[in-house]
Amino acid sequence: MDKILLGCHVSMNKQNNYLVGSVNEAISYKANTFMIFTGPPQSTLRTNTNHLYINQMHELMNSYKIDAKDLVVHAPYIINIANSVDQNKWKFTVDFLIQEIKRCEEIKIPTLVLHPGSYTTGNYKDSLNQIIKALNIVSNYQVNVKIALETMSGKGTEVCSRLEDFKYILDNVKNKDKVGVCLDTCHLHDAGYDLSKWTEFKEQMKQNFSLDKVLCIHLNDSKNMISSHKDRHANIGYGYVGFDTLVNVVFDKDFSNISKILETPYIDKTPPYKIEIEDLLNKTFTNRL
């Protein structure tokens, strides 16, 4: 079997030389892939990519056999391309998304995960159409970067907690090769999908889109019971999704070539990723957190 691509969200900051620090953090967890934000997730503040140590990042990754094609960027949370109510806000977030795409192209990271957004006070179907409209616009700026729309928990007015929403979007975007899906195991569970029946869930996916549309997986346990629509991540093996179910996801041969990214909570301000990665690869829950 191919090597398991397993990593986590890592920080990127000035004191650790930006992207060089991101690679070093991933290496410290024995991760062979990772995900970053290119700036604060709740802000439009961005450091010019010329200052992010891009070349040094790629040199360091090469020495540790980490492939840039496996890396993931998460788009800022403030982007809401589903907004069908306020066109000025919608245009602002589309423009900001274009800037993020350009940054991914410059950093040479090919997958940009994006929360599809919320319909707020608008109409659900109108919001899905706004997403399609936005994706059609930004596709003109995508050269090597693909957007992975993330499965959501259905909290509040979030769209895309149903696989059918992804089918509708993927069927109707113009440049179908530039858009895919990011599966989030916590969100799927909270949205009502029973991932302990993984084979059945994959069949449900196949009824809506082909499995090769899955560009990455966010691997998280959940603090809440199924169908809770809460979106509260738990550490691996400590939640309602369960360790064995998450091991099944990690070792699924259909997804062997895509990155599984942990976004689990810190324990007493300490990242849990090294232990979680080790446990998952060993298929053994050691209860060390």
Curated annotation (Swiss-Prot):
* Enzymatic reactions: Endonucleolytic cleavage to 5'-phosphooligonucleotide end-products
Q: Which residues bind Zn(2+) 2?
A: 150, 184, 218, 263
InterPro entries documented for this protein: AP_endonuc_2, AP_endonuc_F2_Zn_BS, Xyl_isomerase-like_sf, Xyl_isomerase-like_TIM-brl
Q: What is its EC number?
A: 3.1.21.2
Q: Which annotated residues bind Zn(2+) 1?
A: 74, 115, 150
Which EC class does it fall in?
A: hydrolase
Cofactor comment:
Binds 3 Zn(2+) ions.
Q: Which residues form a coiled coil?
A: none
Q: Per its Swiss-Prot or TrEMBL entry, what cofactor is needed? A: Zn(2+)
* PROSITE patterns recorded: AP_NUCLEASE_F2_1, AP_NUCLEASE_F2_2, AP_NUCLEASE_F2_4
Give the record's keywords alphabetically.
DNA damage, DNA repair, Endonuclease, Hydrolase, Metal-binding, Nuclease, Zinc
One of its Pfam families is AP_endonuc_2
Protein role: Endonuclease IV plays a role in DNA repair. It cleaves phosphodiester bonds at apurinic or apyrimidinic (AP) sites, generating a 3'-hydroxyl group and a 5'-terminal sugar phosphate.
The entry's family comment says: Belongs to the AP endonuclease 2 family.
- Protein name as catalogued: Probable endonuclease 4
The opening ranks of the lineage are: Bacteria, Bacillati, Mycoplasmatota, Mollicutes, Mycoplasmataceae
